[in-house]
Every structure is written in structure tokens, then in C-alpha cells.
């Protein structure tokens, strides 16, 4: 029960609920920058001709009651103007007189909670471009070289390596006519998505299906000696997604998980240090420990 959770010294949640722990600020607090990003005369929707200044190089938080204009300011005015000026996007921003300071940035990255994909074929590994590295790694295994397997052999979207009965889905749809369709595990591959020959190729004792069933944290241990793979896995862990399975279907992820996947993808890319990150309610639904991880990035 709640009282036991709060009093338990071994419970992370209890530590936060009791006040023994909390989301910490960075011990080395950054000094405000001389440069600022300034929105002039924002007047769209509920905004009433306001000027807003954001210090460059710091974490800025926009908060307020529902309907106060937070989303209008950040998403409709700032994000759309930045997308237009930095990326030539054809977006019409909300009414305002101008934005000063965008010259301090060379790109704008907007990270929201919209789904990363409706298809069950999309997963964390494919979204952050990790699956490409894994397929290449499996194609370099000794058995793959003997058999002439290419990275495409380890894609469940292509004929050759996938199970042809379920077409790489791992599930088979049963038409129930007047009832909703039912999906059952493929009898041929037992849900593994690949054919027997492909699953005979192993990396450190694991085949490709077993790797996709691993959590991100477990995979980090397996690929310790492969820097390019490990870097992506560690970035996923840094945003608090170490518990997700590499092959977990995208349509089973929450909005917060989708948002952190997007953030991980952006952080794993080469950056110039001049990116403007716009996060829409990044802590919604997160445990305090995950909020701390987000703050520590």
C-alpha cells in the first residue's frame, strides 16, 4: 500500500513521494547568456500583444494555466517562424510583429508526443536508425559471409530472410467475417519474423530475433565493443528508455516514450551546437527519476 511504499528505503517512488528525494537542479548552474531570442508583439489567439525574451543557451520553461497561450506562443509562433526562416518550411505562424535572435541558431528541432508510426513494423531500433547497424553487423558474421548474406537478409520487410508465411509480421490475421479480425502468432516462425536459415546466424550467441527481443539496457551490454551501435543505445538509455525492447512495436508506445525516442534520434545526430530544441510537455506521464534523467541531458 501507499504508506509502505512511502516508508520503504528501497523504493525509488517512495523516496520521491516522501520528500527524501526530488528532481535536482544542476550543481553547476549556467550563467544567463547575453544573447536572447525575443518574440515581439505576440497576439495570436489568447495572447495580448506581449513581448517574450528567452535567454540563449539555457533551458527555458513556458508555464501557465490552460488556455493562457503557451502552445500558441511556442508552437504556433516560435516553432513555425523558426521552421520557415531556418528550414524554408511553408508554415504560416500566428500573429506577431517579429522574432529577434534566430541568427544564433542554424536549425530548429521540434519534439512532440505524436506517434512515431502506426505500423507494428516500426520500432525503436528502426526509428533511431539502429536497425541498419545491427543488420550490417549480422551480415559480417562468419556464417553470413559463407552463405553470402547481405544486410537485407536481416530485414523483416524484405523477401529472403523473413518468414514468408507472415511476411515478417510474426503474426497472422484471421478473417472473422462479421467480427473484428483476430491476430495469432505465426505457426511457421513462432512470432520470430524470420526463417530458420536466417536465425542460424548468431552474434555472440544471439540471433537477430533474440536481439530485437532484448531491452535497450541488455543490448548495451551485448554491443559494448561496437562504438557506433553502443552510442545509439546509450543515448536511448540517457533519455530513460533503457527498459524498452529494441523490436517493440511503435504502436504500443506512449506519447512520452515516442517523444523521448524523437529526442534520442536528434541527440544522436552530429550537432553544430546551434540547435533550437522545442519540447512540448516533455515530462508528461514521466516518473520523477525519468524527469531527472531528462534534466541531466
Where on the chain are the PLM-derived regions?
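Conserved phosphate-binding elements of NTP-dependent enzyme cores
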Residues: 1-297
